[in-house]
Amino acid sequence: MDAAVQVQRKKASNGAQVRNHWNVEEAKALYDLPFADLMLQAQRAHRKNFDPNHVETASLLSIKTGGCPEDCGYCSQSAHYATGLKATRLMRCADVVATAQRAKDAGATRFCMAAAWRTPKDRDLDSVCDMVNAVKGLGMETCVTLGTLTPKHAARLAEAGLDFYNHNVDTSPEFYSKIITTRSLQDRIDTLAHVRDAGIKICCGGIIGMGERVEDRLGMLVLLANLPNYPESVPINLWNKIEGVPVEDTAEPPDPIALVRLLATARVMMPRSVVRLSAGRQYMTDELQALCFLAGANSIFVGDVLLTTNNPKVDRDADLLARLGITSGLA
């Protein structure tokens, strides 16, 4: 047996804390543990920091769809590709609040608002800040994703009372340039630093199933875990099939057990993060989702649509959580 695997297996058996400064080799040794040992370590980390029978429920709305100048090779909203998606203007605040109220009535406790921009213009940011303030007035947590931010942008959002800012790193540093060329990984990391400096919590994760290697998935986790403060929320997305984008030619759905292993590894590496089982759940069986929750995933998006792709029906989610004895709400 490899020495690194022996060390990780020993830690799984005695409950010792895994170090905070990670490299891909350590993450791979953890990921490759015998399944029961990995799940045990993930459960220990999960139970130490969260109620293991509870998931956070969030809702996601595209407040400005399509026409994005970035060339992210996985995205239906990029203006670089003919995906058949019609670009829209920024929604009115009243319409956003009405949607948030419906999401709250359906059980969501966090409302996430996404705009397909490279970076927000000042007048648009003012409108988003009004939305944040109004949604918070409903008693919901707020999250927005608006592209890259300057320190001034982040400070303005903090002043509006924003709880979370989502800005995914998407994949490993090594695979990044194969899917995006118009925005560097450092641009993303700089935005995360501006958000953190403004006192806003970070939501940051990535996408799997784009043709990347297992080492790329783990490299993404290492990047996140080694940030000065790792994200409070880590969404793991399965790529949703979108016709007309470059990733369509390289995509390969991950093996279900590989997904569970990745979630368990994320849970151990970032034990205090909310790990969100995000896009792609409509392709998963109930049994797979149950394993994902057992691995430490403790957040989902509820609602029939995620931006431009489908999501499990609300009734299906409610039935699954009830059968598992899992409550939902704020994490």
From Swiss-Prot:
Keywords: 2Fe-2S, 4Fe-4S, Biotin biosynthesis, Iron, Iron-sulfur, Metal-binding, S-adenosyl-L-methionine, Transferase. GO terms for molecular function: 2 iron, 2 sulfur cluster binding; 4 iron, 4 sulfur cluster binding; biotin synthase activity; iron ion binding. The keyword Metal-binding applies. Its cofactor is [4Fe-4S] cluster; [2Fe-2S] cluster. Belongs to the radical SAM superfamily. Biotin synthase family. It catalyses: (4R,5S)-dethiobiotin + (sulfur carrier)-SH + 2 reduced [2Fe-2S]-[ferredoxin] + 2 S-adenosyl-L-methionine = (sulfur carrier)-H + biotin + 2 5'-deoxyadenosine + 2 L-methionine + 2 oxidized [2Fe-2S]-[ferredoxin]. The keyword 4Fe-4S applies. Homodimer. It comes from the Bacteria. Pathway: Cofactor biosynthesis; biotin biosynthesis; biotin from 7,8-diaminononanoate: step 2/2. Residues 53-272 form the Radical SAM core domain. InterPro entries: Aldolase_TIM, BATS_dom, Biotin_synth/BioAB, Biotin_synthase, Elp3/MiaA/NifB-like_rSAM, rSAM. [2Fe-2S] cluster binds at residues 112, 143, 203, 276. This is Biotin synthase. Its EC number is 2.8.1.6. SMART domains: BATS, Elp3. It is an enzyme of class 2 (transferase). One of its GO terms (biological process) is biotin biosynthetic process. Disulfide bonds: none annotated. Catalyzes the conversion of dethiobiotin (DTB) to biotin by the insertion of a sulfur atom into dethiobiotin via a radical-based mechanism.
